[in-house]
Amino acid sequence: MTYIHKPQLIALCSDFGNKDFRLSALKATILKENPTVNLVDISHEIPSFDLVQAAFIQSNAFRSFPEGSIHICWVFNVGEDRGILLALWEGQFFILPDNGLLSLICDQYKPEKIFRVSDDCFRFRERISSVIKHIVSEEDLSELFDPCEDPIVKINVSPVYQKDRIQSRVCFV
């Protein structure tokens, strides 16, 4: 299996906000193990646990990045811990919690590959940094991680068209 490697950019999207240490701790952990990567912030102002808004922002942003970029989209509710996924889709890598976010980003499309990086999100900063190192080092990901056949799937909200109205949800303003 051939993978697209040599990512130039790591794009970050989260619900961390900018008021505490979490974002800087994530960036420092990534750079400590991967000093040659370039970090780009997409957004860290997603409302807490809002998977729909995170998916909307991520799915609209990632196509602007060069092939082989790594996208970390971390919007996570501790009570729903099913682990960490690594997906390859449209020539880009996605690292995110297994909480349905991947299915919302990809909508009706299926990623080429999905790997389960970890069964839990404990120490996620270190795990994410390690996954990035494997990708940057051009290692065979299928030898390092098990395929994930059953990621959590969530369905995007679609508008309902009626004779005199359209009913939908606003996910981003």
Regions found by a protein language model. Give the residues of each.
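Conserved hydrophobic/aromatic beta-strand scaffold that supports enzyme active sites
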Residues: D15, I84-L86, V170-F172
